[in-house]
């Protein structure tokens, strides 16, 4: 999706669409920010590809391993597809020349709990693959404001379905000054989300919006838990 650019981005997207019509689509629009751009693309994908079983978020500057999507689908196949499911994985941090820096997450520190999901996500959007139930639930229960699309998908699946986390990395996560969040390394970007973009009062607002959007789908226990964080 072209987010209201003023350069030749749209012409480039159209060229790709004409060259690869079976695998490439393009959506033009006004500037709404990265979170709503991803959201509008997902709305379009859910409507247009009504036979798709899985969907994935993708950033333009990362490098996927050949088996990235297969690994995700293999992990999700055996799960209960009547509930929202999201697969996410570790990421390999690399510099602009694709030299490995380190793995982003220490698996021993990953806590997949509902309580932790109200203050932190262990799912990087570019690793996410989710089922149709998750995608349809996301696009039909949008909060009034979405700050970070992948955090919302993470919370949705944590409270209404299941998060499948893979400690193995299938993606090279490029670190440079042009990354959308704007930090040089992954942990710096996550700290910015938590300490800057997601200060305590902003997290409370995020959780309040999540509760308002999904209250009719949440259990009484989940409503009680989220209410403690708003």
Predicted regions span which residues?
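Nucleotide-sugar donor-binding/catalytic module of glycosyltransferases
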Residues: 1-186
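C-terminal subregions of glycosyltransferases and related glycan-biosynthesis enzymes
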Residues: 139-140, 145-146, 152, 172-230
């Amino acid at each position: 999706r072209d987010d209201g650019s003023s350069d030749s981005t749209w012409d480039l997207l159209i060229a790709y669409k004409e060259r690869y019509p079976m695998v490439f689509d393009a959506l033009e629009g006004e500037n709404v920010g990265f979170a709503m751009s991803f959201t509008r693309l997902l709305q379009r994908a859910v409507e247009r590809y009504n036979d798709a079983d899985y969907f994935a978020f993708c950033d333009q500057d990362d490098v996927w391993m050949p088996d990235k999507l297969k690994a995700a689908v293999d992990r999700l196949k055996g799960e209960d597809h009547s509930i929202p499911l999201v697969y996410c994985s570790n990421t390999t941090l690399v510099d602009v020349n694709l030299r490995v820096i380190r793995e982003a997450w220490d698996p021993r520190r990953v806590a997949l709990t509902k309580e932790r999901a109200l203050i932190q996500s262990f799912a990087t959007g570019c690793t996410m693959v989710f089922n149709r139930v998750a995608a349809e639930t996301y696009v039909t229960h949008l909060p009034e404001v979405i700050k970070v699309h992948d955090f919302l998908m993470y919370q949705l699946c944590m409270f209404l379905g299941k998060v499948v986390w893979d400690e193995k990395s299938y993606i090279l996560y490029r670190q440079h000054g042009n990354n959308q969040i704007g930090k040089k390394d992954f942990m710096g970007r996550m700290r910015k989300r938590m300490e800057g973009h997601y200060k305590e009062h902003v997290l409370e607002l995020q959780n309040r919006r999540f509760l308002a959007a999904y209250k009719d789908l949440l259990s009484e226990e989940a409503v009680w838990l989220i209410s403690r964080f708003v």
